[in-house]
Amino acid sequence: MIDKTCADPVAAIQPIGDGASVMVGGFGTSGIPYGLLNALAEKGARDLTIISNNAGEGEAGIAALLKLGLVAKVICSYPRTPGSVWFERRYKAGEVALEVMPQGTLAERMRAAGSGLGGFFTPTGYGTKLAEGKETRVIGGRGYVFEPPLSADFALIRGETGDRWGNLSYHATARNFNPVMAMAARHSIAEVRQVSTEPLHPERVVTPGIFIASLCEYAVRP
């Protein structure tokens, strides 16, 4: 019998060790897997590469990992926000490396990884510092830069409802980067507001269970 459920976030994140690359779902403060991130902070895995849209806000989530000095590199599209205090402290101190890319490029690189594609050419960033060191081409009279697929060892994502097979649904805009990260990572871990005892209706499934290694219930909605 397939049952991908874990007792709690602490059990779910046990496979994550030092030096891992970790995709983290969320956009701003919506759809962030706070339960899994808090458990990862408590575990203390170090030298992490965090891939997310933002670089954390306040004291929780990604910010908690930065505060504890567990992050070696951040890959994101929007590192500075009014609440990104811990990222700014670590970055200015030279303790965290940063790779920035346009938001659409970030999403498409992950989608390419999840779809088994070898990368893509995009006009976004052509002729700017973001294109330095990358392959460029002129196609149809327009400049393009090549972007490779972006994968990760793990993805931590937040869903609304899941079943024991790992099928997930999402709540409104809390969906954001979560589905594409679930596909792009080699080992995806989900927290959901509710684990259903019955299979999710196929029309409700956004992320099929084939992409989810494990899931746990974390009822608190940030």
Model-identified regions with their sequence ranges:
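Conserved alpha/beta enzyme-core scaffold
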Residues: 1-222
